[in-house]
């Protein structure tokens, strides 16, 4: 039996939840879902240009886990851009920086790990990602 997924620490929530090709109504486009923690990995590594070890530390994951998140995010973005699909940012297993843990449903302090032990709630898109 697989262990429960751990929360990834996210410092930034996107202001928009969907990007799409210009001139085509969203209702006519297929979508690719990017999880919030995947966008955070892209932001830390590619936008802020941090070293992978620093990115992993900020997200409170191991370096191999960070690498897997980053590779998955880049593959999804490349697929969406090359095939003209919309990109929707939603879902995932994450907690906001030193703030609110959506899974534990309470405030967490700076440096406090999210050790949520409840039942992991998988979204429909999580089930299709495997």
UniProtKB/Swiss-Prot annotation:
<dbReference type="Pfam" id="PF02001">
    <property type="entry name" value="DUF134"/>
</dbReference>
<comment type="similarity">
    <text>Belongs to the UPF0251 family.</text>
</comment>
<dbReference type="InterPro" id="IPR002852">
    <property type="entry name" value="UPF0251"/>
</dbReference>
<protein>
    <recommendedName>
        <fullName>UPF0251 protein Swol_2090</fullName>
    </recommendedName>
</protein>
